[in-house]
């Protein structure tokens, strides 16, 4: 359904005129906008209408002006690399080079090498090995395990971690032996541990007995002890120890024999011989 416009022609003209005044007041400070508009209309010509369409006209082409010649200095001008030397300036060998003739100069070889190097840089190298799609979980696990870094040590036990662990284990053993020694020393303050130099190769270790020895009887254990005692005596004669150690060992053996003879007559019960397990250290000091 058609409805008449809300604003009539007079109101539209008034809006257009007020917009012209507002735009003039925004850009110019003169009091008369109409006189300003008439002055511009007289100075500036109205835009011409485009020419009517007609047959296509062949307009003449304008030639570009020639550029001024550059000042030339003697000896500063270098020959064109593709012209084949100084003759290219006159058009002799230069024409042949432009039409595909071989110049044969060192500059041409350098230029060709530079072009080949630039083309090589533009090429994208292929990846080796060629990547392939992972289709299953098993393939992913196999690729991951194959690319892991293995231990680079060829001989086991030569790494820094293993050597440090061994040193720590040795120090712990030494500390444990010292702790055991001090505990036994506190329990038996009267007893003094005996330490001697290690025996030679091929010889048996000597067994040290505590001052308080027990009795023995004619049981099988007593027989084995007597055999051990005879072996110790023979071993002492072979190695010939120092007078101090021999006297102490002899006194210990005699006391052990006297105690064993006296205790055998009193009772038939056998007691174990207490062997000191104190560690032996060298170097004169703990």
Swiss-Prot record:
Protein name: Probable protein VP2
Posttranslational modification: Phosphorylated at C-terminal serines.
Highest taxon of source: Viruses
Pfam families: DUF755, TT_ORF2-like
Region (Disordered) residue spans: 67-108, 183-286
Biased composition (Basic residues): 222-241
Coiled coil location: none
Residue spans of biased composition, Low complexity class: 242-265
This protein's UniProt keywords: Phosphoprotein
């Amino acid at each position: 359904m058609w409805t008449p416009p809300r604003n009539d022609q007079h109101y539209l003209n008034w809006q257009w005129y007020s917009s012209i005044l507002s735009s003039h007041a925004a850009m110019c400070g003169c009091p008369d906008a109409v006189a300003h508009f008439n002055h511009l209309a007289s100075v500036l010509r109205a835009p011409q209408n485009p020419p009517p369409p007609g047959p296509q006209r062949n307009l003449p082409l304008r030639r570009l002006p020639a550029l001024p010649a550059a000042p030339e200095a003697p000896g500063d001008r270098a020959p064109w690399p593709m012209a084949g030397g100084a003759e290219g300036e006159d058009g002799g060998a230069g024409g042949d080079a432009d039409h595909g003739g071989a110049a044969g100069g060192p500059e041409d070889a350098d230029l060709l090498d530079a072009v080949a190097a630039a083309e090589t840089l533009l090429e994208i190298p292929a990846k080796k090995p060629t990547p392939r799609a992972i289709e299953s979980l098993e393939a992913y696990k196999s690729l991951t395990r194959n690319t892991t870094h293995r231990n680079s040590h060829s001989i086991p036990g030569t790494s820094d971690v293993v050597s440090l662990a061994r040193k720590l284990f040795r120090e712990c053993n030494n500390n444990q032996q010292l702790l055991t020694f001090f505990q036994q020393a506190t329990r038996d303050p009267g007893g003094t541990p005996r330490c001697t130099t290690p025996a030679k190769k091929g010889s048996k270790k000597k067994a040290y007995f505590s001052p308080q020895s027990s009795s023995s009887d004619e049981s099988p254990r007593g027989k084995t002890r007597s055999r051990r005692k005879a072996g110790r005596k023979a071993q002492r004669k072979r190695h010939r120890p120092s007078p101090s150690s021999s006297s102490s060992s002899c006194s210990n053996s005699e006391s052990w024999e006297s105690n064993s003879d006296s205790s055998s007559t009193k009772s038939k019960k056998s007691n174990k011989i207490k062997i000191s397990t104190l560690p032996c250290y060298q170097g004169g000091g703990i």
